[in-house]
Swiss-Prot record:
Produces ATP from ADP in the presence of a proton gradient across the membrane. The gamma chain is believed to be important in regulating ATPase activity and the flow of protons through the CF(0) complex. It comes from the Bacteria. It comes from Malacoplasma penetrans (strain HF-2) (Mycoplasma penetrans). It is found in: Cell membrane. The keyword ATP-binding does not apply. One of its GO terms (cellular component) is proton-transporting ATP synthase complex. This is ATP synthase gamma chain. The keyword Kinase does not apply. GO terms for biological process: proton motive force-driven plasma membrane ATP synthesis. Keywords: ATP synthesis, Cell membrane, CF(1), Hydrogen ion transport, Ion transport, Membrane, Transport. It is a peripheral membrane protein. F-type ATPases have 2 components, CF(1) - the catalytic core - and CF(0) - the membrane proton channel. CF(1) has five subunits: alpha(3), beta(3), gamma(1), delta(1), epsilon(1). CF(0) has three main subunits: a, b and c.
Amino acid sequence: MASLNEIKKRIKIIESTSKITNAMKLVSSAKLKKQKELFLNESIYYKKFYDLFTYIKSNSDSEILSLKKSEEGKTIWLAFFSSMGLCGSFNLNIVKELQKHIKSNDEIWLIGKKGKNLIKSKGIEAEISLDLELDDKDINFDLFHIIAENLLAKYKNDYNIKSIKVIYSKFVNSLSFTPSVFSLLPLDKAIEKPRLDKPNNGADFSIQPNANDVFESILIDYLATCIHGAIVESKVCENASRRNAMDSATKNANELIKNYKLEFNRKRQSEITQEITEIVSGAKGE
């Protein structure tokens, strides 16, 4: 049984840990609020751009839409992980979803420091062609525009690349987020549906010089927008997961402190009672 001094030391250590996890929870909450506002604001832009792109695509017969690909070809997976730890099952859920779909001849492009070691630890044999560490301050559209350009070039020039897919965390609410997959190339099936009506944004416009030229000129922007939207949404989920993990850790620490204090008080009371008994017994002996 632990002595009073040992119990005191444990309480101090756990109290120190509780302060750290609570501070991290507050930081994560602040980041979550900021990222959530960014995500909600940019979702408006994503929706309007998606509607416009779908309309232009439905009027285009660009060769990129009919590229012949090998049925035995590989898929490039653009996977989003965190660059920091202590975010609960956030990264593990992405790996589990990746394991459901990936094949050994596929290729992985990793965004986020924590992905590489986790993927290797799970025995995924696919080649990792890109391993990019990405902090919150590094999120900018220019970076994803470059990634989109490289992905499109590989897709157009390599017959054996049959598809490019994105796997990321989809935000449901602050307590719920799930791994999700969508096709970047070939274009998602929802975009394949013909659309004759113009986007309902109150503007009257025409496509000049023609739908094919406009489609090919904004395709990179569309791909970059999809990638940017996925990383922003993943960042919301990451900070929500970290906030929840730190909140749970703080509550568990406080519960441990409570239990140790009860144990400390019981042991102290027992020792005091023992001392009183010994004093009384000694007095009677005299």
